[in-house]
Amino acid sequence: MTAARNPNAFDSILLVAFGGPPTGAEGYPFVKGIVGDRPAGEARIREVAGHYEHLGGSPFNKLTYEQSIALAHELKTRGITAPIFSGFRHWNPFLREVVAGMAKSGHKKTLGVILAPHQCWVSWDWYKDTVTAANQPLEQPLALTYSDPWWTSAGYIDASADKIKAAFDVLGPKAKDAALIFTAHSIPINMCAQCKSGERKCPYTPQFSESAKAIAAAVGRSEFHLTYQSQASQHGQWTQPDINALIEQQAAKGLKAAVLAPIGFLCDHVEVLYDLDVEARKTCEKLGVQYVRASTVGTHPAFIRLLADKIQERFDGAPRLMGDLVLS
């Protein structure tokens, strides 16, 4: 029998994510909305918009909704039936609209879940700031709390490891000598100075490294590479090495096959489908390296259970209410 959960903990759950345009034609306004009106960025805007056109749009929102549906089913088995809303920073439905709609519908206490495995200003703090900016002006703002991060939690590690093992299986006998290459989104070095997340200054790269080490151990690999991808600009310093540069370096040393594992992403959206499956694949083919890409965690049951665990921790830890009294 499912144990009864604290019904007064939260009346709603908000999944907070990046977002993406569902059609290729919407790629340009989407990218421009991120980069802004800087004239120097126009060429890069058109270049990246072309990736969305090439793929016919981004599946990001659709895949996030699939995660929310799977999460709702898992939570229901635990006695948690609070409705789940999905809001995006860079595309419809925008966080400002979702938060306002939740408040208008009478929701009062919301648990936010940031869909990012590693914390930095752009992947964590910016999301929270966006939600706060949407919430504060409301006549009756939501009382917001966020679930904890989970970069080394078992569900994320196990789900990632399963996806990587499946990718190595594709290689057959070549798997033994294939390289395991982890990727995460490259970020500007100066962005670390803005980071407020975690107990250490900008935990993004240490968390990525810790995730990779744990996942590699679960896969049974003692050797692996850490790389970054999808650098948004040629200006300034960014986290390195770049995925394509590392492939070139390893190919020069005799590498013949590689499994790329985009553990910095939670679903197979454009940064994965284009920057890896098109660009990194092209680099591999040019150098005679067999390319295999592990799927992201998506709706893997272990990952969904992990999200549910983090939500349940908050629900069970919330004070129980009786009238105007808080029962501690």
Name what the model sees in each region.
Residues 2-328:
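Active-site-proximal alpha-helix that buttresses catalytic centers in soluble enzyme cores
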